[in-house]
Amino acid sequence: MSGVRVLVCGGRDNLDRAFVFAMLDQVLAKHPLMAICHGGATGVDQIAGEWASAHDVPVTEFAADWSLGSKAGPLRNARMLDEFRPTGVVAFPGGRGTADMTRQAEAAGLPVWRPVAEQRP
């Protein structure tokens, strides 16, 4: 796939569909050839998947293997970086999993955009 590959992450409790859609619309307007990936969780991940379906944007889901216990999330996050090879990250507000994802992405030298409600169009 040519174009921008965007990893989307954020909190499970973040259910602001309009906000997530508006911010991803901004990314799509700048990068019409894009694909996204997410971690398959409820909240932002699920909303990002819905957004991708509504906009015919290719989406890849990386579910965590929770049988691995507390390291499942960080291992899934590393897998998203290694296998999807994103060119950037959109990190919506979240908790420890989002913080781990952004730490790993920044350590890999990827740009991370952290949208906040004030950026809503």
PLM segments and residue spans:
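Acidic/glycine-enriched connector segments
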Residues: 2-6, 14-121
